Amino acid sequence: MVLFLLLDKTGNDEIGCVLAREGALIKPGRRWKHLHNPAMTIDRTVEGELPVSDIVEKATALVEELYAENPLPTIRIKPSEAAEPLPVTVSKFGGVPYLPAGVEAPTDSDGVPMGMVAQINCTELPENPIYPPTGMVQFWVSTNVCWGIDKEENHRVIYYPQLGEANPDAVATWEDHERDFWWPIKSECALEFTTPGREIFAPNDSINHPLLEKWNQAYPEQAITSLDDFDVYDVEDIEDFTGSGDYSRLGGLPHFMQGDPRREYPENSDIRRRTVNLLTMDSYGNTVLWGDVGTANWLIAPDRLAARDFSQVFYEWSCS
């Protein structure tokens, strides 16, 4: 391996470095200087000059192997701000929730009604092995300043197997700046569901990515320590499996902004068993904002999901 120094546009000042094998493909649009042979400067100022297809083909083949070994079904959610109030029985972020006649909103540890941040009408989903085929899954969090992350009692996931007559007195939760109340959902959003395929990337976890181990086993002479090393090649195709995953989804992998909080619990803890991603809710423009453009995630143990037991779901939200 050889250390190359990144030069500025003048070719005179060193502004960075990269470790690469001799003769490696390195990022276009830059000038690089061999550390041990300063006279050897690699001019890569012309975009599209590098034959990077070999790297992409190798990585793509390994990704397909990972898909075959451990596919993670994913349903992508595309929100859009509703032009008018949506029916209470449809999938949505925010707005008036579906509540059966005679049923009130769940309350938090202080006895205050929680707010519904998302509800998924299962009949509107593409065929999938994650959600029940019928009914409604709702996500509720406390309206306190922590948005329910402070206590187990302050967030709920509720499943209604069948939809019947709705409670006409159900109300939406909106923020009120006059009383200094902030809420992640600024406006009701309609949801569109698509199935882009499978996920194996782990946003913000490039060091533990399964592709990392598989790449180093297959190509030890080109070993990398993190998927961030692929950034050297500046290839858009690489983003298909090292991307940040900045979108809302059902299934797939959660998107933790500050690392996976489940790691803070012992290996044998029940929290570690909650591995199925029920919902990742990503910030969306100025309409959905989890803190400073963050995300929220809900995860459940596979056996509880199979039993339609949503009483113990791991919930977290964090921002960048």
Language-model segment annotations:
Residues 6, 41-320:
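Preference for intrinsically disordered or flexible, low-complexity segments
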